[in-house]
Amino acid sequence: MAKSIRSKHRRQMRNVKREHFAKKDLDRLKRLASKAQELDLDNVVTMKSAEEIKNKPSTSASDADKGMEVDNTKKVFKKKTQQNEDGHYPQWMNQRAVKKQKVKVAKLKTKKKIGKKIKW
């Protein structure tokens, strides 16, 4: 395909933009490099020797003995309606499936009501 004037102009403008931001980027990188040299890493990080770590009593061992409190309550869903006790549908069920299920449950309810009324 032939190159349009529009695409040529866009390419030209992208190049101008690239040059413009290259200057700003270079300045920013220079500033970051100068700040990195000024920063003294000795004040930021404190190293501990292996002996200090071994001699220090560990508090995490007492936490491991206690164990973790876990809530093991399972969500129970009714098979017919697929709702839990609160009337919510499962999290994995999308809205389209929820609407379909509601229609199905409504049909079951109307069939039950009709069946009860006909008894003589």
From Swiss-Prot:
<dbReference type="GO" id="GO:0003723">
    <property type="term" value="F:RNA binding"/>
</dbReference>
<feature type="region of interest" description="Disordered">
    <location>
        <begin position="79"/>
        <end position="120"/>
    </location>
</feature>
<keyword id="KW-0010">Activator</keyword>
<feature type="compositionally biased region" description="Basic residues">
    <location>
        <begin position="97"/>
        <end position="120"/>
    </location>
</feature>
<dbReference type="GO" id="GO:0007613">
    <property type="term" value="P:memory"/>
</dbReference>
<keyword id="KW-0804">Transcription</keyword>
<comment type="similarity">
    <text>Belongs to the learning-associated protein family.</text>
</comment>
<dbReference type="GO" id="GO:0001099">
    <property type="term" value="F:basal RNA polymerase II transcription machinery binding"/>
</dbReference>
<keyword id="KW-0805">Transcription regulation</keyword>
<dbReference type="Pfam" id="PF10169">
    <property type="entry name" value="LLPH"/>
</dbReference>
<dbReference type="GO" id="GO:0032993">
    <property type="term" value="C:protein-DNA complex"/>
</dbReference>
<dbReference type="GO" id="GO:0003677">
    <property type="term" value="F:DNA binding"/>
</dbReference>
<keyword id="KW-0539">Nucleus</keyword>
<dbReference type="InterPro" id="IPR018784">
    <property type="entry name" value="LLPH-like"/>
</dbReference>
<dbReference type="GO" id="GO:0003676">
    <property type="term" value="F:nucleic acid binding"/>
</dbReference>
<protein>
    <recommendedName>
        <fullName>Protein LLP</fullName>
    </recommendedName>
</protein>
<comment type="function">
    <text>Acts as a transcriptional activator of C/EBP. Required for long-term synaptic facilitation at the sensory motor synapse. May function in noxious stimulus-facilitated memory formation.</text>
</comment>
<dbReference type="GO" id="GO:0045893">
    <property type="term" value="P:positive regulation of DNA-templated transcription"/>
</dbReference>
<dbReference type="GO" id="GO:0097484">
    <property type="term" value="P:dendrite extension"/>
</dbReference>
<dbReference type="GO" id="GO:0005730">
    <property type="term" value="C:nucleolus"/>
</dbReference>
